[in-house]
Structure formats: structure tokens, C-alpha cells
Amino acid sequence: KVQEALKKYEVLKNEDAEWHFIGHLQTNKIKDVLKFADMIHSVDRLSLAEKLDQRLQQEGRSLDILVQVNTSHEESKYGVAPEEALSLVKQTARYDTLKIHGLMTIGLFTKDEVKIRKCFKVLKEINDNIVKEGIDRVDMKYLSMGMSGDYQIAIEEGANMVRIGTAIFGARNTPDAYYWPSEKTDADRAKQME
């Protein structure tokens, strides 16, 4: 994903665009991601926050981030466990270079709207609890949840940032091993669940 993003950035870097990195970020890819990312949606562990902070200090700048929460509890998905999200936000907020602006989650790949909705409700509850804490340098303005197949439910549950690439650009035939270790597209997975 990082290599793909870098290629796109090279083509479009002179355009007035805001670049968001979405996907599992390995610490050895931080330097490359920071070449283009205005925001990272997938900070899911303290070790990643520490490495980002170190690199950003070297570069003398800060970065907007979202903390990724695994509200579905699926082993194939990344994200901090819901019960550990508040702690991760508090610990990450210590780094002046990291500007926490909200949370991100990926709902279950299922046709069961009740289960999908539950994932989004959990993220909204975590968000509300973090807001109540009043943590310094934390501005919870984004709830990034919902993709092409479930964005309407996500919006109903409070999402103000959705990821709808498939609905706009069509299904991609590239593996997304960071979340779902297969060659299947979202459309393939949806058919499988029918």
C-alpha cells in the first residue's frame, strides 16, 4: 500500500490535495509514509506512536492522526481493542508531534446490519468517553467509519468521515493483506456472505 501511495503521490504531488494514509502501518515504512501523508488513520499501538514521534521530531513538524480501533474484534483486522482505546489516546497525546483528531474503525463484512451498526456504536461511545475526559492536545472531531457497503449505517451512527472508494472508482482487484489476507475484492466478499 505504501508503494502504491508513493506512486500516486509522485503523479499528483503538485495538485492541491490532502493525503490520508489508511491501512496498517509498519514502523519500517514510516519514513516513506511521511513523505506524503497529511493524516494517518491507523495509529493502533503505542510503539507506532513513539516511532512516528521520533521521526516527526527529526523533521521538525507535526502530523494529524486518527486512532484505529478494532470494534469488530476480528483477528484479521488491525486496531487497538476497544477497552484499550482510551489508554492509547492518553499515552499518544503526550507526543507534541501527534495531533489526535479522532477515531477510525472498519465494520464487519456481513449483511447483518445489526452487527455492523454495533461496531459503529462502539466507536461512537469510545469517542464520547474520550471527549468527556478532556485530554490535552486531543481534538476529537472525526469519526472515520463506513466504507462503500456500510457507509449509510456509519453516518446514521455518527460518522463524519467515510471511505467509499469502491463506490466511486469500482472494485479493485488487488489484495489487501493488511486486513483480509486474500485476493478477493469487497464485491467478492459480499457475494460470499449471501
Where do the language-model regions lie?
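C-terminal helical cap(s) of enzyme catalytic domains, especially alpha/beta-barrels
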Residues: 1, 9-12, 155, 159-194
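Conserved active-site alpha-helix within GNAT-family acetyltransferase domains
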Residues: 152
